[in-house]
Amino acid sequence: MIAKTEADFNGLKEIGRICGAIRDELVALTKVGITTKELDNRAKELFDEYGALSAPKETYNFPGYTCISVNEEIAHGIPGSRVIKEGDVVNIDVSASKDGYFADTGVSFVVGEGYPEKEKVCQVAKDAFYAGLEKAKPGSKKSGLGKAVHNLAKRNGMTVIKELTGHGIGRSIHEAPDHIFNYFSRWDDELLKDGMVIAFEPFISTKEESIIQSTTDDWTL
């Protein structure tokens, strides 16, 4: 989507604010002993309170209102009976729509304290997001974002999940550009445009660069 009007910007800001608020409340609720389903149930209540719709549920009939991935799960984890434990690495992914505008946000964090290696991965992911964001300017190459992410990961002795990417967003959950890679591709010479709306999603890993599809469901990676 290319945002052009005041209505566009206001609509995008509103749904972005809602997604961020739901994400932050779920993070605060993620304590030892709670299940991912209980977290998702609270997300449903919040969607209703804000007058928003879960994007994965409405668009893809995903079996949850949010994606909650734990430890070995990198993305699209289905909320269920899994109980959160001390030291778990949790990713909460919230995407939603309101009045025809979509937003997508997520964060990874460690439950509890005293897990420096796990905490470092989460911090590098946050740092990579901001490093890439600095390259997101009209007229710059889209590939510059991925280059910034990958370089920062390598400087910290890590790498990226190459098959998971960011994407365009705005009037639907997935729009052009179809992919915003987390590494540099010299063939990717598309330029970012003024007003282009994107969901930029660094995926950082200590070792693996590829995903494996879960054998127990069609969603979890």
Give, region by region, the residue ranges found by the protein language model.
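Active-site neighborhoods and metal-handling regions in enzymes and metal-associated proteins
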Residues: 1-221
